[in-house]
A protein has these predicted regions:
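Conserved catalytic SET/PR domain of SAM-dependent protein methyltransferases, capturing the structural core
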Residues: 1-280
């Protein structure tokens, strides 16, 4: 029993020490390969924000069309121009869309990861990490990822620097700090999960969901919402992706916000999202 307890404590320490400030200060120079210096935010871009937004819209529209038979409440609230746009997308003479429409007629839909593969040419999923004691990781399950592609989003509740996050942060390895000090809590368990669900329900407008909460479950509607499980590089394995910060614009289509895996802790804030990008 003591040996098992000590082994468990040692494993927890190996995971936690990278967030323990004194240990980081003493060991910073021992791992030069894992350091990444960013001179300023404007230079920390793999691709432009326009390209990021274009990718998100492309994927989210494909997911929306795939769920078209479940969107009746939303469609009735949209302007005619927007409704006609989606009806036109369904009727486009393209083999992929034809097959999609046929599946709708059969009261069936593609899985989200299949939509991602058909839209971007690859799919990703969570699985046990190949790194020792790293828990879960993210793997490309189909296709290949080109350089500069958006491969995932970092989900979670978005906290401004002045907002309370102490209790959520205890023993939480999924808190991501942005360059400007904004924090994203990507933990899908415990109090973090409760806070996210509460904020998501608070911001809902009738049939319109302002965020996606399915990343908290095993049945994810947005297949990109796995970024919190992307592991850092190690001395043995270099990073093949990097994080790029992106603010979702206020004019983002309201019918597609149901796929955004982020929600602001305060209802008056509309800051969303970190994206994981293909780096090399």
């Amino acid at each position: 029993m003591p040996a098992r307890l000590l082994r468990g404590l040692w494993q927890r320490w190996r995971r936690y020490k990278y967030r323990f400030v004194p240990w980081i200060a003493l060991n910073l120079n021992h791992n030069p390969r894992t350091l990444r210096y960013v001179p300023e935010e404007s230079k920390d871009k793999v691709i432009s924000d326009e390209d990021v937004l274009g990718t998100l819209l492309k994927v989210f529209q494909a997911l929306f069309i795939n769920d078209f038979n479940k969107q009746s409440d939303i469609l009735t609230m949209l302007p005619e121009t927007v409704k006609s746009k989606y009806h036109n997308l369904l009727s486009v003479q393209h083999p992929r869309v034809k097959l999609l429409e046929y599946r709708h007629q059969q009261q069936s839909t593609f899985k989200p990861e299949e939509i991602l593969y058909k839209t971007l040419g690859f799919s990703v999923a969570r699985a046990t990490s190949s790194l020792i004691s790293a828990g879960k990781g993210v793997f490309v399950t189909r296709g290949s990822v080109p350089k500069g592609a958006v491969v995932s989003m970092y989900p979670g509740t978005v906290y401004q620097k002045y907002e309370p996050i102490f209790f959520q942060s205890i023993g939480n390895p999924f808190i991501f700090r942005c360059l400007d000090g904004v924090l994203i809590d990507g933990n899908d368990k415990g109090i973090s999960k409760v806070v996210y669900r509460s904020c998501s329900g608070r911001d809902r407008l009738g049939p319109f969901k302002m965020s996606d909460s399915t990343w908290l479950t095993s049945e994810i509607c947005n297949p990109l919402a796995v970024g919190q499980y992307v592991n850092n590089c190690s001395n043995d394995r270099a990073a093949n992706v990097c994080y790029q910060e992106f603010d979702v614009p206020a004019v983002f289509p309201i019918e597609l916000k149901q796929y955004l895996p982020n929600i602001a802790y305060s209802c008056d804030k509309q800051r969303f999202g970190n994206l994981t990008m293909k780096k090399r």
